[in-house]
Amino acid sequence: MSPTYLLDNNVLVFLQWGDPHFQFGPIYDWVDQMAESGRIHVPEVVLGEFKNKERKQWFEDRPHLCLKHDDDQDECLATLVNELPAFVDPSKTTEDGDQPLVSAAMKINMLGTGAYASGPAVVVSHEQRRKAAYPYLKVPDACDHYCIRCINFFEMLRMEGVLTI
């Protein structure tokens, strides 16, 4: 079974400000092709975090890329927040896409395998696991809890044979 990749906001920001070879070039065509085939998604809440108007418009013009939030994700989100209360930082005053990102992966796995873990979902994030002194979990920590693979953008490109170094 081919993986289904879910992109985090920090990957979108990386594509905007990262290596100039990736900006507005063939990498976006590849992302679009992967989205058309159902292999790459950006959860709706995560896309809502993206602030660059021009790039955000590019994503919004491709509805096949956006993974709409639904009742199944809400159920996964409730489970996630209940099982991992340290994944929610109560001091944040804006909606955070981290929890919906992981709950979307849980939903895809549940639909594919009947369990939250060991399914086709792969979270793509540049976030690092939390440091011991930090009180809240990060995306990779929550993915670890549910045995959801969490990789960075370059690892995804390598897995798909796009990047060969």
Q: How does the language model describe each region?
A:
Residues 1-42, 49, 53-60:
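Short, well-structured N-terminal submotif of metal-dependent ribonuclease cores
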Residues 93-123, 138-142:
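Acidic, metal-associated active-site segment
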Residues 41-44, 143:
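Short internal beta-strands
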Residues 7-9, 43-45, 97, 124-129:
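Short His-Asn-centered micro-motif
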